């Protein structure tokens, strides 16, 4: 039985999705300020590993727990919604099916409490 990670296209596809997501974040007036001063290469590596893991890929994420990573950022529902929107669009642009995109966004939504540090 294939996993969501496999259906999406594995590591190369997740890397492409994250690259597309970062382009969208950089031009989003709500999100771009949150990432000002962030080492985006390091953030990319963490996000690729995190998404790969929650999409049933290899356990790669070795960063701090999400709530600790996001502590002090004052992330709110509009931030989460914007990231989710951009992630869904990035997946569509990279050819991920609507069904797999929905499954991926459901998994990200399951992490919302930790992402928003709530």
Curated annotation (Swiss-Prot):
Q: How does it sit in the membrane?
A: Peripheral membrane protein
Q: Where in the cell is it found?
A: Membrane
Q: Which residues does heme bind?
A: 70
The transmembrane segments are none
The protein's matches in Pfam families, at most eight in alphabetical order, are given as: Bac_globin (PF01152)
PROSITE patterns cross-referenced by the UniProt entry: GLOBIN_FAM_2
What GO CC annotations are associated with the protein? Answer: membrane
Q: Which cysteines are joined by disulfide bonds?
A: none
Q: What are the entry keywords?
A: Heme, Iron, Membrane, Metal-binding, Oxygen transport, Transport
Q: Which cofactor does it need?
A: heme
- Entry's Gene3D superfamilies? Globins
Q: Example GO molecular function term?
A: metal ion binding
Q: Which domain of life is it from?
A: Bacteria
Q: Which residues form a coiled coil?
A: none
Show the SUPFAM superfamilies listed in the entry: Globin-like
Q: What CDD domains does the record point to?
A: TrHb1_N
Q: How is the cofactor bound?
A: Binds 1 heme group per subunit.
The entry assigns this protein to a family as follows: Belongs to the truncated hemoglobin family. Group I subfamily.
Oligomer and partners? Monomer.
> What's this protein's name?
Group 1 truncated hemoglobin GlbN
Q: Which organism is it from?
A: Nostoc sp. (strain MUN 8820)
